[in-house]
A protein has these predicted regions:
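N-terminal pre-Walker A segment at the start of P-loop NTPase domains
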Residues: 1-12
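Phosphate-binding P-loop
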Residues: 10-18, 104-105
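Hydrophobic anchor at the beta1->P-loop junction of P-loop NTPases
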Residues: 21-23
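The conserved Walker
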Residues: 26-27
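Eukaryotic short linear interaction motifs
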Residues: 30-31, 55, 62-65, 120-123, ...
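Conserved substrate/cofactor phosphate-moiety recognition/catalytic segment
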Residues: 33-107, 167
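Glycine-rich phosphate-binding loop used to anchor ATP phosphates in small-molecule kinases
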Residues: 83-147
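Conserved GTP-binding G-domain of TRAFAC-class P-loop NTPases and closely related GTPase folds
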Residues: 145-302
């Protein structure tokens, strides 16, 4: 994936404008930590009175709705409730975004942190919520990577570094409202999300509508440690290729029947090589400095 050459121009965040922060990320890609901890903490440390920050989390909305349904229907499991509240989650998410827009303050920099996955691009989001192109801007954050995955024509906009580190975060995650490492389907769900990004071009996805080309900005962030040269042997690469090439995203029965053994074998290799050894560095301090630079010096315009 190649980006157009960056211009030197940087556009500073202005009072009275609204900035939507959106991430193109995998499961456990650092999105929630980026929003809830790093940005919220950094803006508070810099000058909290300067910003009006709202966060809208699709996962949190779905968890709340699932718990409400389960309370009314004690014979249903959380998973059953979770599966039933998808449409209501989408409606409530849109309503909360609109409410956040309406809470705009003219004397502050308004930031809406959009905690939701957008594997199909943000075109629909722009059409739904970009009503004032003079004061609404969309900052799309993607992982800063060295080399994207390309296995015999199977192309993904993420690096093997990023893919492995996100998986390890998922494996060791507990207490999340939607997906945890101990969940039986966690590997299949992770690969399903990854599959949605096959042949995905970040730049084309965010610039597909010329109407908004001056309102959307692409920003790279060090969500993971890209300093290591990660390689897998040919047999492991073939194993991964055979799974991801034919996998039908979120068809859990098909995945379990046809690919579960190969999936487990592949991730067992990853676990043995990289889990629990302190191989990858923590990048949160680096991300914080990148956020400070953005807040103080503005957005790089592509």
């Amino acid at each position: 994936m190649e980006f157009p050459e960056k211009k030197e121009e940087r556009i500073k965040l202005k009072e009275g404008n609204t900035y939507f922060f959106i991430c193109f990320a995998l499961v456990c890609g650092g999105k929630s930590t980026f929003f809830e901890q790093i940005i919220s903490q950094t803006t508070s440390e810099q000058n909290k009175d300067k910003y009006n920050i709202k966060i809208v989390s699709s996962d949190k909305i779905r968890e709340d709705l699932s718990l409400q349904m389960q309370k009314k229907n004690p014979n249903m499991t959380f998973k059953q409730c979770f599966d039933k509240v998808g449409k209501e989650t989408a409606k409530k998410f849109d309503a909360q975004i609109r409410a956040a827009i309406n809470q705009k303050m003219e004397d502050k920099i308004n930031i809406i942190l959009v905690d939701k996955n957008y594997p199909q691009g943000i075109g629909k989001f722009l059409k739904s919520f970009c009503k004032d192109i003079s004061s609404q801007f969309f900052l799309v954050f993607i992982p800063n990577i060295k080399k994207s995955i390309d296995i015999n024509g199977l192309k993904f906009p993420y690096s093997l570094n990023y893919f492995i580190q996100c998986y390890l975060r998922l494996k060791n995650r507990h207490g999340h409202e939607v997906l945890n490492g101990e969940d039986e389907s966690s590997k299949a769900v992770y690969l399903s999300f990854f599959k949605l990004f096959q042949n995905f071009d970040f730049y084309k996805k965010i610039n597909s509508d010329k109407q908004y080309e001056n309102n959307v900005f692409l920003n790279t962030i060090d969500f993971t440690d890209e300093s290591k040269d990660i390689e897998v042997d040919k047999d492991t690469e073939i194993l991964f290729e055979n799974v991801i090439k034919h996998l039908r995203a979120f068809d859990m029965e098909n995945i379990k029947t046809n690919y579960e053994k190969d999936i487990n074998n592949y991730f067992n290799i990853i676990d043995e090589k990289y889990d629990g050894k302190g191989f990858f560095a923590d990048t949160r301090e680096l991300i914080k400095n990148q956020v400070i630079d953005l807040l103080e010096n503005g957005i790089n315009k592509l």
